[in-house]
Amino acid sequence: MTTEQIYIHNYRVIEKMGKGAFSTVFKGLHRVSQKTVALKVSREKQTHETKILAYLNREFVDGVPTLLWYGRFGDNTCIATTFYEATLQNYVESIWSTNFDPCLKVLGICVQLITIMDNMHSAFIVHSDIKPDNFMVDSGGHVVAIDFGLSSLYYNVEKDVYKENKQCEHLIGSPKFASYNLHVGNSISPRDDMMSLGYMMLSLFHIQIPWSNMQEVESDLPLYDIRHPSNIKRAELKRDLREYLRVTYVDKYLVPYFEQVSSLEFKERPDYKSYREIFSTLY
């Protein structure tokens, strides 16, 4: 049976778009409306991600996909969402290769990314897995966050209670983009999405991330354990990042951005307006 003969609910599978550790994403087509969708198929239950995305949709949060369907497919669970053709990384690379003033375009993308975080955090959700793979771009050039499997509520509105900052021994999300605060044992909060976003922005501006080419050190500890030798080294480099940027790049945008987000307390609301202004100022 070819891929195009497979149906998941009302969606015909067109082609495989990508595969992760726990799921595979396909491009699909609704059998009646012919609307193109993204189909995420996983052997793991996706109820948590589905609930997060449904909640964000109910809260009318801009910058996230629309959840179109959720259900079973054989032994797998599946969700159908809005389809986006371009990954953020590919979109940015095309900007650098084809635009007369690519930096100006990338600055605009940074403003969009900050606004998406503002929108999500205003709904009391932390994304928790900020990295280039988890952002797409629609046909109009609008950036969208995806993959909410690690996302969580950081504030209980009904009880008016902020999540406790408990000592944690494991990183959440990619070690490469995990916030420095997580490396030193803090729980995740909005400040950490903003810190991880800054690390990601380095790559968007083609700035070398100091820890990106690190060789993983062999250890009996899990890779996500903050005591893993590789994570201890990453923590040191992330701690010294601002000085690295000052000396190496004399960066006008990311140095002041990191200065602001690095000073945030666990429960402190990030100053999204101020961050947007940093990247809205022309060089």
Where are these regions (language model features)?
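Conserved C-lobe activation region of Hanks-type protein kinase-like domains
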Residues: 182-247
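Activation segment/activation loop of eukaryotic-type protein kinase catalytic domains
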Residues: 138-172
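ATP-binding glycine-rich loop module of kinase domains
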Residues: 22-48
